[in-house]
């Protein structure tokens, strides 16, 4: 993202690019800039693009990020949904952080990896959760410097998790073995392990469903309708340092007042990004 789109074709064979500033190599803030992730989030959450209050979604939603400037958690209950999710999954050193005018946001798990408190404050009567993060090493596993450093790095998060767990009615903790946060190629296996663990709670869920039925029929959750197109009032370029705003808008070729569908916008952004 430090190369203008006109020159990116010259870098297609590079495995890694490190910018040089003032005769020094600058280490990036993350191995993955996240453009494809952002594109995917924008694609799947297209129907919710104009919903800025997450309580108005078919199922009310919130997510957490961590501001590394203040070391405090940031609770997203509104805004642009893909941006909120992108910030909440920005694993430090793996994905680049999300920067705002005053904050540098990374994965919320740095401070709070399980948001039972926020769900209760949101009005949840029953909290059902699944925890798949690091649970801490036993004494016998703390025989290496790496293990000790990892344990120290998670001390705050682990202590907070125990507090959040006490606020949970049903907690599902699949046994993941060697699977970790970066096991992107083990999706099917991870889902299968979660499913097997959830089956152990089948009787609990059935009793819970029966107790809820005693309150009468529940309103069905109506999914968002897919949106054919949006009409932009204005188009503004921010954070640009490499080429003129006019060039960017020219390549984007999307004008205020025109109907813009998802495929067209994704195609133009891909072209612009190079």
Which stretches of residues belong to each language-model region?
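Patatin-like phospholipase
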Residues: 1-270, 274
